[in-house]
Curated annotation (Swiss-Prot):
One BP term from GO: Gram-negative-bacterium-type cell outer membrane assembly
Superkingdom of origin: Bacteria
Annotated signal sequence range: 1-23
Name of the protein in question: Chaperone SurA
Every PpiC domain range: 197-301, 312-411
Keywords, alphabetical: Chaperone, Isomerase, Periplasm, Repeat, Rotamase, Signal
Entry remark concerning the domains of this protein: The PPIase activity resides only in the second parvulin domain. The N-terminal region and the C-terminal tail are necessary and sufficient for the chaperone activity of SurA. The PPIase activity is dispensable for SurA to function as a chaperone. The N-terminal region and the C-terminal tail are also required for porin recognition.
Cited Pfam families: Rotamase (PF00639), Rotamase_3 (PF13616), SurA_N (PF09312)
Name of the encoding gene: surA
Organism: Albidiferax ferrireducens (strain ATCC BAA-621 / DSM 15236 / T118) (Rhodoferax ferrireducens)
Catalytic activity: [protein]-peptidylproline (omega=180) = [protein]-peptidylproline (omega=0)
Main location: periplasm
GO molecular function: peptide binding; peptidyl-prolyl cis-trans isomerase activity; unfolded protein binding
Cellular component annotations (GO), alphabetically ordered: outer membrane-bounded periplasmic space
Protein role: Chaperone involved in the correct folding and assembly of outer membrane proteins. Recognizes specific patterns of aromatic residues and the orientation of their side chains, which are found more frequently in integral outer membrane proteins. May act in both early periplasmic and late outer membrane-associated steps of protein maturation.
Amino acid sequence: MNHRLVALSVASLALLAPLTVPAQGLRPSSATVGAGVLAPARVPAATGLAADYIVAVVNSEPITNNEVRAALQRVLQQLAQQGNPQVDSKTLVRQVLERLINEKAQLQLARESGIAADEAAIDQAEQNIARQNQLTVAELRRRLTQEGGVPGQFRNQLRDQILLTRLREREVEPRARVSELEIDQFLREQQSSTPAVQQINLAQVLVSVPDTATPVQVTALQARAQRALARARAGEDFVTLVREFSDASDKASLANGGELGLRTADRYPPLFLEATHNLAVGEISALVRSGAGFHILKVLEKKSAALPAMTVTQSRARHILLRVSPQLTESAARDKLNEFKKRVAAGQADFAALARDHSQDGSAAQGGDLGWANPGMFVPEFEAVMNSLTPGQISEPLVSRFGVHLIQLMERRQATLSPQEQREAVRAMLHEKKLDEAYISWAQDVRGRAYVELREPPQ
């Protein structure tokens, strides 16, 4: 199962700091930052209080107003690049602060657990970024300084990302192991079930309820959700309601009008399935209360998905992945990949060589080659574009949760899945589901065990 993308399920959308799962075939490096150094966007100066002050304390470590504002700058940049309309500023600031609290608690756990990122690992990450920008390390640092960054802070960010990645891999991955008995049970259930597995695409408005909310605050938030529900059932445009009411932290969900994606039913929370079981396409659910808050669900699509056919069309593709980061905007990544495409089309460059030099995926060493893939092995947005290509054709840059891709389809063939291949496909699916569930539980546990004191609200 080498060289495979593994998608995060919709269950993780309610978290403010979702796990960056090292995908098979798109495995992030210790520092997932890429080409094109960019100065951070500017946010208007804080007023009323001093420019910097403590807004929260996680155990014994403070989070300052400036930290929140710097993180907010990055989020605003990403929202603007995605063409996302304006989001309620108070809601966004609250989400950014909560994300920083979660990350702070996880970083503390990493250090307490003896996880470390030595200078050699950070040096390597910095060298990779410089190489991807076609710069020396000295030139990279000068450019960061010119664009308002601080090289020392940049290295600290790299260190934190390495720590978080190593912690999550150590703590969460073991909880998602799939046994042979689980595979056997799944296959037996599929063979004995008469109806085909259903696939559902939902959109949601999420009015978040903080863990610390008082009964009065919960009542007010429920009333807000009820207003959104009434307008949805009155026929107002759901996308407009998402933009006005939704507190969903997943930026891709907000940009897509709250759409959660076409998934098999078992990849949605049971609460969602219960609320939408008897709804037709286009209908709106009643208010759903979860640990994250109040949800309003709209059924966008329902269809049956039969078990995988014994004979399938396999595709072999290669790709170049550039990861979006504070140093590489989505727009800059698209421009860079478009330039690569032009160079290959003009015979000035080789796709595999470009992948080896620039791709930020584990397949880079193989020239971006992802190997032969069965249907369903890649995330939907990647697979849809790949399936539209003819052998030899190169796609336009496309965005997935992993970053921005340039895909070249190499060849296609008809193949019969062996029993072992079927088992491996089931293993990957069950692992993905368990990984989502394990991360949600783990992240909530880490957050719950931390002492968090909220002070002056950020500005």
